[in-house]
Amino acid sequence: LFLLKRGMIKIKKKDIIKVGSFFSGIGSPEKALQKLANENLIDGYELQFFSEINRNSIKSYCAIHNVDEALNLGDITKIKGTDLKYCDLWIGGFPCQDISCAGNMQGFDLKSNTRSSLGWEMIRLLKEIENKPKYVIFENVASITSKKFKNTLDLFKEDLKNLGYELYDDILNAADYGIPQTRKRYFLIAILNGCDSFSFPNPILTDIKIKEFLDKNISEKYYLSSDICEFNDGKIWLANKNTNKLVYEVDVEKYKKGGLCGKDHSIKFVQSTRIYSENGFAPTLTHSNLANNCKLAINVDQTMKIRKITPNEAWKLMGFDTVDYDNASKVCKETALYEQAGNSIVVNVIYYILKELLTK
């Protein structure tokens, strides 16, 4: 180690990174750090603590990363900064429900008591500790940068600057980093005292499609039954959950440019009414009813069928592998596994961010 200005200590590229994880979910940053270590880009990482309140997520996290539940500090509002071990890196993807376009849009103002306002708890903890982490990464939905939330985000960033952090932020799409999912997320990188410069990773150009992430030998329970949907002479049958199996036949030829289709355009178009090609990208996977919100048109023995994605496929579309899923599936049911995928950060995206941050 060697000293920099203001007495700060710079991390050598091969030091073991001490990590604190907030709003941990199933730990995609930890998965990304392990991948960097496996590639000998860092010596490894040491988890000092994680903070998660969802019981199922805690079980999956411990199963995936092989850590003791005693490392979980639980509710972030009950954590005292003075009790935290030193970390080189903090990471937190704080709740998006009050910021997301799919949520109630109540915002994340300080002391507003919305779930999304819990992001301010990380700043509170930064104010309470003397030996601050060199790096802090925040993640949330892209709409946090919208006009509606601009003032709050500016105040959030101003507090970080006042604590001595230099800031970098951008919106990255998982589809640009080797995952066939359209998922745009906002990342805010804070570097203490500007010891390092940082640039967000360039997109990784690939032709990867959903079909490369699909499981083999799928159970029939994931397929929509023929009384709900069928393909017939260039037309597709679409079902809406509120129609009690009543379906509408729509001439696909009229919609060659893509987009949505329905009876006289009178259906309220929501994600659950859409069918996606296996030769394209998945939509943004969310924790809410994920299985029904991502239906695929699959060629099975020269016959087109429609099915839900499996929870294992959902995990793969978030950058986790089947070993991770298998470990989590031993402690959680499918419903929880779908939710955990939808709430996660995409491993590939945070991997490339951490690679730029820690190895350049």
Where are these regions (language model features)?
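Short beta-strands and strand-loop turn motifs
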Residues: 135-141, 331
